[in-house]
């Protein structure tokens, strides 16, 4: 077994053995998924509460949605099961306050149905590859994130995430060096938020920005927010390892995806073909589960230009080892860092790759 895995029971076993009523915090898709999985594991909820501003006497899945104070008055002691995702500072503070008073679980569920998830069997199956990536990561903080996140995904205790979080802007400025002639490729540009982040990192000076976004509503927002910037190429397309058409599900949010999509056909592009002979110095990649295909479609530019890269590492559990393995295959000289930024559950994890050759 892996020495850095200290947990032995999974989150569902921990819920069962805690001996406390299980109360969900949150409604919506996340709560649906948690309740379904609890039922499959033979677990039942004792109630549901929401933040006070969202309690309006409604029912959810047969439960009256209560205030936290109502739950406390009704139950002497209970465990809280966080059933929604957030990166908002005030919500994370609320999670931490609950954890100071109660046993708190934040179950990790795969983003995409049918994908592999972290279990004891998964850890045993991939132990060699996980250990190899762990050993090769660039610093101790990366290894701490790697270990903490895997322990969290197994046991469901969010404290593991809070103990290894760092600030995104500080990580970008400390691990990357940005000049005044950067050529930036933003894959999964959303509404332009990461273009604005790039402008802050470079003081507004750059050579070119290429921003790619497949979701129609997000693309319209991107165009509006980037209007007026010079040397910017906006591309409405998905990112893949070949030029083709793919099924795509629009959401108008961050979770627009190629995976299990049934809504419409979109143009998908191989970035080596889009860029042709154009150099790129910095790549941000958050393409909702298509990171492996996106990297494969950038082989030429990664091998020739060795750009610094910021790559989402949370869409699939197997991304934890498959993405760095692929990066090292394309460029063995990459130093790869792993950072966890503010979010519950284990989203906003990113590999940060820097070329360290001669």
Spell out what each predicted region is:
Residues 1-46, 51-358:
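Phosphate/nucleotide-binding beta-alpha loop and adjacent structural elements of enzyme active sites
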